[in-house]
């Protein structure tokens, strides 16, 4: 991991981490649906549990960034992925 030297770099790194978490959840959802389609229900439940934990991580990062007053309004990818994740979890 590249060393972070400034507060600005740190905030960018946190945004990247949030986006990575959201992408991971979306990928887990695709895997979950594929497993269910193949009647692999036990395996799908494991993936659902992992995705749920990833969602908790994403929420923690989201809240942290909001508490730090980081402006996410110019990060359309994050907002789009966040809306997708909320749909996945029926929020």
Named regions from a protein language model:
Residues 1-91:
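Non-heme di-metal
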